[in-house]
């Protein structure tokens, strides 16, 4: 019996595939211990980032149906 492909559930919650084939991700360090971080630092952590090309294969392997 063939192995059933499944998405990595942790990766499915963290990455979204874009129309051009890349993956969006949220930046880290914005969940807790925010009082010591400056407003400027928190502002720069807000926008979504793209997954680096070196990690693209790893993420796409974890999300076979994305």
UniProtKB/Swiss-Prot annotation:
BP-aspect Gene Ontology terms: translation
PROSITE patterns found in the cross-reference section: RIBOSOMAL_L35
Family: Belongs to the bacterial ribosomal protein bL35 family.
Organism placement in taxonomy: Bacteria, Pseudomonadati, Pseudomonadota, Gammaproteobacteria, Alteromonadales
GO CC list: cytosolic large ribosomal subunit
Domain of life per record: Bacteria
Pfam families: Ribosomal_L35p (PF01632)
Entry keyword set: Ribonucleoprotein, Ribosomal protein
InterPro entries: Ribosomal_bL35, Ribosomal_bL35-like, Ribosomal_bL35_CS, Ribosomal_bL35_sf
Descriptive protein name: Large ribosomal subunit protein bL35
Region (Disordered): 1-22
SUPFAM superfamilies: L35p-like (SSF143034)
GO molecular function per UniProt: structural constituent of ribosome
Gene this protein is translated from: rpmI
